Swiss-Prot record:
Belongs to the 7S seed storage protein family. Glycans are attached at residues 229, 488. Pfam families: Cupin_1. Seed storage protein. Accumulates during seed development and is hydrolyzed after germination to provide a carbon and nitrogen source for the developing seedling. This is Conglutin beta 3. Gene3D superfamilies: Jelly Rolls (2.60.120.10). Component of globulins complexes which accumulate in seeds. InterPro entries: Cupin_1, RmlC-like_jellyroll, RmlC_Cupin_sf, Seed_Storage-Functional.
Length: 580
């Protein structure tokens, strides 16, 4: 029992020691866990700031990036699908001419930092303002946009604004020297396909100083020439005869293709100006002049033959033929020898000076033009030989139609000469089938031509477009068939016109007391097609009492000016009455 008593306290003591050790070990382990839990947030923050301290597996990062990319793309597609119906509704509300611009600007717009809300507000504002505009304003803006596009697409903006107008700068010089020049207008169909029917017609102009001669030549084109300034003597050479005619201002003449001719300016002081309508024979739009003599500007057509052919043709040695007809062309090519030779027509070119004795000899047997009655079958005729077909105090309109002109009947060409006084207006009209090429002879003014917009651009509707230009001497403009036109003269204006396809052409005026097609409409039709009533339309038409030509200044403006002058005079008189 005593041993048991001793062992029991010892056992209890041992158990107590073990318990204390266990408690101390547990406390120590708990403190360690607390410290670890306290340090982990700091470690996580540091890991987030610098992920390289604890890198994740590479394949896990790739999967996460791919997942994010797919999520963003799907969200973008959903947003785009939600926007598409709204965009289509906005496009349907906008005018059709603005859709193409919106489509072109849509892609760049996605890249702009501007918000979608701002873009929608701008688009809705522009579409609503466009709907509020009148048809006339939309047409004006559309014309401006098309003109800007044409200006940007080509360097010559003026040419693109009006394809029917050709300034005097559009002439190309063929020959020029100190005695004059010969030049040709560019092809009518070169700038637009709207004038394809004029591809075989060209305008030629030559000017020469006093006492000069344009050398003999023939051409592979028919000509109708008109003297616009000065006087001339033209000699026409045929195989069996030679005829000379004296031409004055306004005289015209048919010159058949292949006819050899030469033109003299016999005046001592006045320059000569002649305009020709050329109709090429061999190649549409192109023609060539053939000269029997050589000069510094061209070679003789004899030089194109071989020596054997020339010797057999003239039954003479080639050396003699060369010295008489061709000249020493080798010396002409040598500049030093060329400038050392005595001055002759070969030095001057195709326009040479002549002496007064030579002028008298060339004019000895010349005939004058026909100034009364119908033109002859050959020989010159004057455009103002008959009374004008339209005339009043504001202007005169002369015309020679193909049925009255045997020379131009087979060419189906008419000739017109129009005189519009300063401040007058040639009333709006159109030609039923003739295309007119008009040359400004003298004066200044402007014209307005009405055409239909190109159907390739506007297939859903036909809208008119106005072509206008300032006119000055030497300018050319074209009046297509069926296109209404009006001409305003800011100074005394003189116009020469060549009518193409002129047989049975009819000129229809759109205003005035006579030959007015609008006036001839039925009364019921007038009330149906115009916004006003039939009575208002007829009253409006009758307001213009003039025919063909009228005052270019509106009556209302004249009345306001008269009232203004009267008001100023009345105001001054009232002041004077108070003083005296």
């Amino acid at each position: 029992m005593a041993k048991m008593r001793v062992r029991f306290p010892t056992l209890v003591l041992l158990l107590g020691i073990v318990f204390l050790m266990a408690v101390s070990i547990g406390i120590a382990y708990g403190e360690k866990n607390v410290l670890k839990n306290h340090e982990r947030p700091q470690e996580r923050e540091q890991e987030e700031r610098d992920p390289r301290q604890q890198p994740r597996p590479h394949h896990q990062e790739e999967q996460e990036r791919e997942h994010r990319r797919e999520s963003e793309e799907s969200q973008e597609e959903e947003r785009e699908q939600r926007r598409e119906p709204r965009r289509e509704r906005e496009q349907e509300q906008q005018p059709q001419h603005g859709r193409r611009e919106e489509e072109e600007e849509w892609q760049p717009r996605r890249q702009r930092p501007q918000s979608r809300r701002e873009e929608r507000e701008q688009e809705q504002g522009s579409s609503s303002s466009s709907r509020r505009q009148s048809g006339y304003e939309r047409r004006e803006q559309r014309e401006e946009r098309e003109q800007e596009q044409e200006q940007g697409s080509r360097s010559d903006s003026r040419r693109q604004r009006n394809p029917y107008y050709f300034s005097s700068e559009r002439f190309q010089t063929l020959y020029r020297n100190r005695n004059g020049q010969i030049r040709v207008l560019e092809r009518f169909d070169q700038r637009t396909n709207r004038l394809e029917n004029l591809q075989n017609y060209r305008i030629v102009e030559f000017q020469s100083k006093p006492n000069t001669l344009i050398l003999p030549k023939h051409s592979d084109a028919d000509y109708i020439l008109v003297v616009l300034n000065g006087s001339a003597t033209i000699t026409i050479v045929n195989p069996d005869k030679r005829q000379s005619y004296n031409l004055e201002n306004g005289d015209a003449l048919r010159l058949p293709a292949g006819t050899t001719s030469y033109i003299l300016n016999p005046d001592d002081n006045q320059n000569l100006r002649v305009v020709k309508l050329a109709i090429p024979i061999n190649n549409p739009g192109n023609f060539y002049d053939f000269y029997p003599s050589s000069s510094k500007d061209q070679q003789s057509y004899f030089s194109g033959f071989s020596k054997n052919t020339l010797e057999a043709t003239f039954n003479t040695r080639y050396e003699e033929i060369q010295s008489i007809l061709l000249g020493n062309e080798d010396e002409q090519e040598d500049d030093e020898q060329w400038h050392g030779q005595e001055q002759s027509h070969q030095d001057e070119g195709v326009i040479v000076r002549v002496s007064k004795e030579q002028v008298q000899e060339l004019r000895k047997y010349a005939q004058s033009s026909s100034r009364k009655g119908k033109p002859y079958e050959s020989g010159p005729f004057n455009l103002r030989s008959n009374k004008p077909i339209y005339s009043n105090k504001f202007g005169n309109f002369y015309e020679i139609t193909p049925d009255r002109n045997p020379q131009a009947q087979d060419l189906d060409i008419s000739l017109t000469f129009i005189e519009i006084n300063e401040g007058a207006l040639l009333l709006p009209h159109y030609n039923s089938k003739a295309i007119f090429v008009v040359v400004v002879d003298e004066g200044e003014g402007n014209y307005e031509l009405v055409g239909i917009r190109d159907q390739q651009r506007q297939q859903d509707e036909q809208e008119v477009r106005r072509y206008s230009a300032r006119l000055s001497e030497g300018d050319i403009f074209v009046i297509p068939a069926g296109h209404p036109i009006s001409i305003n003269a800011s100074s005394n204006l003189r116009l020469l016109g060549f009518g193409i396809n002129a047989d049975e052409n009819q000129r229809n005026f759109l205003a005035g007391s006579e030959d007015n097609v609008i006036r001839q409409l039925d009364r019921e039709v007038k009330g149906l097609i115009f916004p006003g009533s039939a009575e208002d339309v007829e009253r409006l038409i009758k307001n213009q009492q003039q025919s063909y030509f009228a005052n270019a200044q509106p009556q209302q403006q004249q009345q306001r000016e008269r009232e203004g002058r009267h008001g100023r005079r009345g105001h001054i008189s009232s002041i004077l009455s108070t003083l005296y």
